[in-house]
Design a protein with these regions (language model features):
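PLP-dependent enzyme catalytic core of the Aspartate aminotransferase-like
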Residues: 1, 61-63, 67, 71, ...
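N-terminal "arm"/small-domain region of PLP-dependent enzymes with the aminotransferase-like
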Residues: 13-83, 213
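Conserved N-terminal alpha-helix of the aminotransferase class I/II PLP-enzyme fold
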Residues: 71-119, 313
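Conserved PLP-anchoring active-site segment centered on the Schiff-base-forming lysine
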Residues: 127-146
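Structural motif of enzymes handling amino- and sulfur-group chemistry
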Residues: 283-302, 308, 312, 322
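Conserved PLP-binding catalytic core of the aspartate aminotransferase-like
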Residues: 307-314, 321-355, 369-370, 377-379
Length: 392
């Protein structure tokens, strides 16, 4: 009998693992979804109202903005529309478009230094390992994003996770541990992606000052949506001066691709020399960088849309509460917590049957027993769209 090849044995073992995931109702699949104008999406031949996108400000799905952007470049062959930088930034991939975008970001955030990354994941797996080493401690909110958790694991520093938004637990850890470490980093999201709740950054800033810590805030779900000119929750709460490193993304409310961080010039220069996901990757293409610069300037003036988005969020959350449903948060992310995995899947199907595109979020993305539907609202949704979602 012929011995199976290593490749076929691997395939069989992985297939068995996938079969178990499917039996548990947790098999993940890639869905082909076409994004239409506004908050519409097409899936499997049907048009849906999209409540699952991170296009919070409706910018990514706005064809008029795309036309305005491309009208700035009459020559389609312009190097400003190039689809590749063809190099890492430390070689020849640091294009004029990249420098302009970083200048725009720096000006938006009070003339601090800015640096652009290929994604938020790149930023979060690179910043902490570059800055935090042996003899340092990282204290991270327990519900921080997986990319932050991966960054903790890659860093040579010790790390502890404090209970979600439990600042007394954070203080207890600092009181116990601070004296034994050179540097201590406090890392939190501002708006949390699964619960839609917000960190009390004013209180965290006071703790940071009391214990001489370094504060890193991931504003992925707040930039574009919160704060003056969409600069985030730290600016809204008046604590930008206390944030040592602010991480933002272009891939959500700002309708583009990539990420950025705001910091002091010395920190930026250190990252350029030590941050591996920045050093060892091809830079973003000029067309994306120019689009990000264009959209960043547009979004800064969209205070009316930001107010509308918060109004829609309060409307949906309030309607759920009026019906006795379990929800929470204080942002454009509105969770509807169901509990059991299959019940969440069944409810998601019910919404799909009524033209609402929203999916079940299950473990391990959320804790066991807290499967939910995660409604990501967009300023492009209508009142009728939200009323329909609230009534099903």
């Amino acid at each position: 009998m012929e011995t199976p090849s290593r490749a076929s044995r691997l395939a069989a073992e992985l297939a068995a693992d996938m079969a178990q995931l499917q039996a548990d109702g947790r098999l993940r699949l890639l869905r082909e979804i076409a994004h239409g104008p506004g908050a519409l999406a097409e899936w499997q031949g049907r048009i849906y109202r999209n409540f699952s996108s991170n296009d919070y400000m409706g910018l990514a799905g706005n064809p008029d903005l795309r036309r305005q952007f491309y009208a700035r470049y009459p020559d389609a062959g312009s190097p400003e529309l190039a689809q590749s930088s063809a190099s890492s930034r430390l070689l020849t991939g640091n294009t004029p478009a990249c420098s302009r975008l970083e200048q725009t970001l720096g000006e938006l955030y009070g003339n601090r230094a800015a640096i652009v990354f290929n994604s938020g994941y790149h930023a979060n797996i690179g910043i902490l390992p570059a800055l935090a080493g042996s003899g340092d401690l990282i204290l991270s909110d327990k519900l921080n994003h997986a990319s932050i958790i991966d960054g903790l694991r890659l860093a040579a520093a010790d790390f502890r996770r404090y209970q979600h938004l439990d600042l007394q637990h954070l203080c207890d850890l600092l009181a116990k541990c601070r004296s034994g470490y050179r540097r201590v980093f406090i890392v939190t999201e501002s708006v949390f992606s699964m619960d839609g709740d917000c960190a009390d950054l004013q209180a965290i800033a006071r703790i940071k000052r009391e214990y001489d810590a370094i504060l890193v805030v991931d504003e992925a779900h707040a930039v574009g949506v919160r704060g003056p000119q969409g600069t985030g929750l730290a600016a809204e709460q008046g604590v930008m001066e206390d944030v040592d490193i602010l991480v933002g993304t272009f891939g959500k409310a700002l309708g583009s691709t990539g990420a950025y961080a705001i910091m002091e010039p010395e920190v930026r220069q250190y990252l350029v020399n030590h941050m591996r996901p920045l050093i060892f990757t091809t830079g973003l293409p000029p067309v994306i960088l120019n689009w990000s610069d264009f959209i960043l300037r547009k979004c800064a003036a969209m205070d009316a849309q930001r107010r509308r988005l918060m109004d829609l969020s309060r409307m949906l959350r309030g309607r759920f509460r009026d019906r006795g449903l379990k929800t929470g948060g204080d942002s454009q992310i509105v969770p509807l917590v169901v509990g059991a995995d299959q019940a969440a899947c069944d409810l998601a199907q019910h919404y799909l049957d009524h033209g609402i595109l929203v999916f079940a979020i299950r473990p391990p993305t959320v804790p066991r027993g807290t499967a939910r539907l995660r409604f990501s609202l967009s300023a492009a949704l209508s009142d009728d769209d939200v009323n329909l979602a609230a009534s099903l």
